[in-house]
A protein has these predicted regions:
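Bacterial Sec-dependent N-terminal signal peptides
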Residues: 1-32
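Accessory carbohydrate-recognition regions in carbohydrate-active enzymes
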Residues: 30-396, 400-452, 456, 460-486, ...
Length: 498
């Protein structure tokens, strides 16, 4: 079995390399023949083991990831969901996927039998999931829960069983995932069919601001329960209760604008169909020719997972919350969830082949983050720099976009590249002073990992400098990029700290 699977994965890898190396973006689209590629996606892959993968409803690169949240039981619950568990505490509107740290889980709804209920048992056998759609049949209360999403809004449909006495939900604004800790939260405005509020938290993202505007398909009464929870009771239990929730990092007014623009009506099935179409459009950019159904499923599932992030981080009116914490008016789509140490080697180069329409805005995002925080993003989450992982991974991503011709403001991009490489923090001061990172002077003792990453980033800066005719800079960074060789130990044949 092991050799069989190993052979399949090697063949799939080789097939991917041939595709990536042999076609332009146009031919990627021309090669796609199936109009229903979402049938080959299995969103459950990666939800067990150490996969940390999000399971729920979202669209490609969406700000909203609406899905089930389980209690945080340790490292393997970073996404808020793990296949080994069978307890739900809510359906939250924002989740991470594939990360090594847990956060988010914002604005969670939970159907309940009474106001004191805080969790529900469920069975994976009763789940139905595909790209853009998640559903689960619950027993206590007896309700069929369905979720779908757009870029900036979530859509829930609760169909209660014939034996249900009331259609009740609890909105939990205190609940979060992993490191997340709610600091300030409230429902600021309530009408018979709407709620608006905010949730500010501190976690992996040091200062996250989430605003929401929720609209109900029928009149509801809302009662505060304390500790960040509100009980919502619908007028008619015999009718499905639909909830549309717009999200924003700027204001609840913007959250309402996002909702009105993206889900103006109440046609749940149409929003599900639109999400499926959005996924098919992106998946159709690559067609693989194989009779191996396992390889096909692995490939399209991996491609699907590659589009959970980066996430849109600006509203339909162009406003976004910047890295300086201020609200900015942008004429571009701003992005966040930039896990760059993980993605600069493969996911971002893939974007330069199949998501070229996103690249000008991605470059603008990087340049504006530099202008607002003084350095290119390292690991950016909800407008916050986490500085997670080593190196300067924002440099190769932006440099690649410049070198491939997707950046209009080349001088602005080069300033961001150069100044990010010339900082003093994160060991860069030692690199400038000694030409390498001395193990005894670098407090994290991660000198080899950092040093190799910095050498690669310096080579990228040098290439852009050379292209722009900045000969002195090119020479300086080319020399600095050779620092990797200083860590090589000829006796052992390995890189070692010095």
């Amino acid at each position: 079995y092991y050799n069989n699977m190993r052979k399949k994965l090697i063949n799939l890898f080789m097939m991917t390399c041939v595709i990536a190396g042999g076609f332009t973006q146009t031919s990627f689209a021309q090669q796609a023949k199936s109009s229903n590629l979402t049938q080959f996606v299995n969103p459950r892959i990666g939800t067990g083991g150490h996969g940390h993968v999000f399971l729920g409803a979202n669209v490609p690169f969406g700000y909203v990831q609406l899905g089930p949240t389980e209690p945080s039981r340790g490292w393997d619950w970073c996404s808020g969901y793990h296949h080994s568990d069978s307890v739900l505490i809510g359906f939250g509107h924002q989740h991470l996927s594939g990360t090594g740290i847990g956060d988010l889980g914002d604005v969670a709804f939970l159907p309940v039998t009474d106001a004191n209920q805080k969790e529900i048992l469920f069975s994976h056998a009763n789940e139905n999931v595909r790209p853009g759609y998640y559903a689960v049949k619950l027993q206590q209360p007896n309700v069929w829960v369905e979720l779908t999403a757009t870029q900036r809004a979530g859509f829930q449909r609760y169909t209660f069983g014939a034996d249900a006495q009331q259609a009740q939900l609890v909105l939990d604004l205190k609940q979060g995932i992993g490191w997340d800790a709610a600091k300030d939260y409230n429902v600021d405005k309530i009408t018979s069919t709407t709620m608006a509020g905010h949730r500010f938290s501190k976690g992996w993202a040091n200062d996250q601001k989430a605003f929401f505007f929720a609209e109900f398909s029928q009149p509801v009464t809302v009662k505060p329960l304390g500790t960040g929870r509100w009980l919502i009771v619908a007028a008619d239990v015999t009718k499905p209760l639909l909830v549309k929730t717009g999200m924003s990092a700027v204001s609840s007014e913007n959250a309402q604008l996002n909702l009105q623009k993206e889900i103006p009506g109440w046609d749940f099935r149409q929003v599900v169909a639109d999400a499926d179409e959005a996924w098919n459009k992106e998946l159709a950019k690559v067609n693989i020719e194989t009779n191996d159904s396992v390889s096909r499923r692995i490939f399209y599932t991996a491609m699907y997972h590659s589009m959970t992030a980066p996430s849109v981080f600006s509203d339909v009116n162009g406003q976004y919350r910047g890295a300086d914490g201020k609200v900015h008016d942008g004429n571009f789509t701003n992005y966040t969830t930039l896990s760059l140490w993980d993605t600069y080697r493969a996911a971002h180069p893939l974007m330069t082949m199949i998501h070229t329409d996103m690249l000008p805005d991605m470059a603008s995002t990087f340049i504006n983050i530099y202008r607002q925080q003084g350095q290119l993003p390292v690991w950016h989450l909800m407008g916050n720099e986490t500085n997670c992982m080593v190196g300067n991974p924002g440099i190769p991503v932006l440099a690649d976009m410049v070198l491939k011709g997707y950046v209009k403001d080349k001088e602005g991009a080069y300033e961001a590249l150069k100044q990010s490489a010339l900082r003093e923090d994160r060991g860069l001061g030692l690199l400038k002073k000694y030409g390498y990172l001395p193990h005894d002077l670098e407090k994290t003792k991660e000198t080899v990992a950092k040093g190799l990453e910095y050498a690669l980033a310096d080579a990228c800066v040098a290439k852009v400098a050379r292209m722009l005719g900045k000969k002195a800079d090119a020479k300086y960074f080319e020399k600095r990029s050779k620092s990797y060789s200083k860590y090589f130990d000829k006796e052992t044949g390995f890189m070692r700290g010095i």
